[in-house]
Regions:
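Conserved AMP-binding A3 loop
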Residues: 1-9
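Structural detector for helix-capping/boundary residues
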Residues: 4-5, 30, 70, 161
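Conserved AMP-binding/adenylation subdomain of ANL enzymes
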Residues: 8-25, 33-74, 88
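Active-site phosphate/pyrophosphate- and oxyanion-stabilizing loops and adjacent acidic/basic residues
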Residues: 12, 115, 152
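Gly/Ser/Thr-rich phosphate-binding loop
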Residues: 18, 47, 64, 69-77, ...
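Thr-Gly-centered strand-to-loop micro-motif
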Residues: 23, 28-29, 54, 103-105, ...
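Alpha-helix capping/helix-boundary segments
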Residues: 59, 81-82, 109
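Adenylate-forming AMP-binding core of the ANL superfamily, especially NRPS adenylation
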Residues: 108, 147-162
């Protein structure tokens, strides 16, 4: 069962894991009717005082333009969203250097894609595993683990209980 306590804590602890501050700007292109948007994005920003840069609907060009124009420091998405952004013919026209972090979740996250995102978008990828009923994140790679181990070595997000 989802409670205010676990939704608030999940958003807060995810932000802590990603070192969010009030200086961050999160580009939100995931749906707000889903736990990815409402907990990992909205609650994260509410508990850390971050700015949310809302994209009306997912369109790789709109996302790239929003990150570029607003100088976003974080970006969330599922693997297919990142593939669409990286493969967009106008990708090289946008400055992604303001990005420092983001979440890739919702599906298996290929290590090669995570490497491409880090190289081309300059952001450290946090791959979160969870489920809606857990509000939603349960595990994420420990911050000391290198990307090559991201697919196999995970740490439980703080305060997770049975």
């Amino acid at each position: 069962m989802l409670t205010h306590y676990n939704i608030s804590n999940n958003g807060f602890l995810t932000g802590e894991h990603m070192k969010f501050t009030s200086d961050d700007k999160l580009c939100v292109c995931v749906p707000l009717f889903h736990c990815f948007g409402v907990v990992l994005a909205t609650m994260n920003c509410l508990t850390h005082g971050c700015t949310q840069v809302m994209v009306e609907r997912f369109d790789p060009l709109l996302v790239l333009a929003s990150v570029h124009k607003e100088r976003c420091t974080a970006l969330y998405g599922v693997p297919t969203m990142f593939i669409a952004e990286l493969n967009h013919p106008m990708f090289d026209m946008f400055d992604m250097s303001s990005l420092r972090t983001g979440i890739m979740a919702g599906s298996l996250c290929p290590v090669e894609l995570m490497k491409r995102v880090e190289e081309k978008m300059f952001m450290k990828v946090t791959s979160v595993y969870g489920l809606t009923e857990a509000s939603p994140g349960m595990t994420a790679p420990a911050s000391t683990i290198r990307l090559m181990y991201a697919a196999t070595r995970w740490a439980v997000i703080s305060s997770l209980r049975k």
